[in-house]
Amino acid sequence: MFKAELNDPNILRTSFDAISSIVDEVQIQLSAEGLRLDALDRSHITYVHLELKAELFDEYVCDEPERINVDTEELMKVLKRAKANDRVILSTDEGNLIIQFEGEAVRTFKIRLIDIEYETPSPPEIEYENEFEVPFQLLKDSIADIDIFSDKITFRVDEDRFIASAEGEFGDAQIEYLHGERIDKPARSIYSLDKIKEMLKADKFSETAIINLGDDMPLKLTLKMASKEGELSFLLAPRIEAEE
C-alpha cells in the first residue's frame, strides 16, 4: 500500500513543472524513506534528480517499495488543476496513479501508469572545485535579462563575483553578483539558455540555488527546501564552442 498526503500542492506542481519540460516519462521510486526519481532527457543534455522525504508529507505510508512509470505531461495536466488551499493525496491502485484534491470539493484523477521497461540512469560522478549560492529569483531574473539578446549564456565565477553574460547580434548583457563564498579556482562555461529556463520553472521549491561550476563542465544546480526534506537538482551539459 502506498499513500501520501500533502497540504501544499505547490511542492509537487513546481517540481513537475520543471521535470515535465525536460523528460516525457519518469520512473518514480516509492519507499518507506520517501519518493525519488532520476531521469535523463532524450538528448542526454539534462539530468534531473528529485527526492521528497517521507517526513515532508503530512501523512505517508509505503508498505513495500514500488516503482511506477508516469507520463510527465499527463501528470502535469492534473497537478495544474490543484487550487492553492487543496490537500493533495497520492496513492496507487490497479495500474493507476490516483491523485485527489480535497478542498471545497473532493476531485479524483486517475493517471494510467506506463508499462515500459525503464532503466533508471545513475548520476555522473563529477568533482567540482567551486560551489556557491545565488538567490533563486536573482538567477531567474538574470536568465530573463540574457534572453533579450541570446540563446546561450556564459556563467563565470571568481573569488568575488558570479557573472552571467551573453553577446548577441543586437546587444550584450551582463549581470554580476557578489557571492561571498570562498572560490579557489575561477571557472567559466557556456550553456543553452532554453535548457536553464526549463530547470528554473521550479520557482517555488527553494529561495536559494546552489551552483557548482567548472571550466567547460556540466552545470550542477541544486534546490533544497529550507526544511531539508526535499531536494531537486539538475546537471546540464555545457555548450562547447570552437575558438574563433
UniProtKB/Swiss-Prot annotation:
Any matching Pfam family: PCNA_N
Keywords carried by this UniProt record: DNA replication, DNA-binding
UniProt KW DNA-binding keyword: yes
An individual GO BP term: leading strand elongation
GO molecular function: DNA binding; DNA polymerase processivity factor activity
InterPro entries, alphabetized: DNA_clamp_sf, Pr_cel_nuc_antig, Pr_cel_nuc_antig_CS, Pr_cel_nuc_antig_N
Classification via Gene3D superfamilies: 3.70.10.10
KW DNA-binding (keyword) present: yes
CDD domains: PCNA (cd00577)
Description of how the protein assembles with itself and partners: Homotrimer. The subunits circularize to form a toroid; DNA passes through its center. Replication factor C (RFC) is required to load the toroid on the DNA.
Record family assignment: Belongs to the PCNA family.
Role: Sliding clamp subunit that acts as a moving platform for DNA processing. Responsible for tethering the catalytic subunit of DNA polymerase to DNA during high-speed replication. In conjunction with replication factor C (RFC) stimulates DNA synthesis by PolB, relieving inhibition by replication protein A (RPA).
Protein name: DNA polymerase sliding clamp
Organism: Methanothermobacter thermautotrophicus (strain ATCC 29096 / DSM 1053 / JCM 10044 / NBRC 100330 / Delta H)
Lineage summary: Archaea, Methanobacteriati, Methanobacteriota, Methanomada group, Methanobacteria
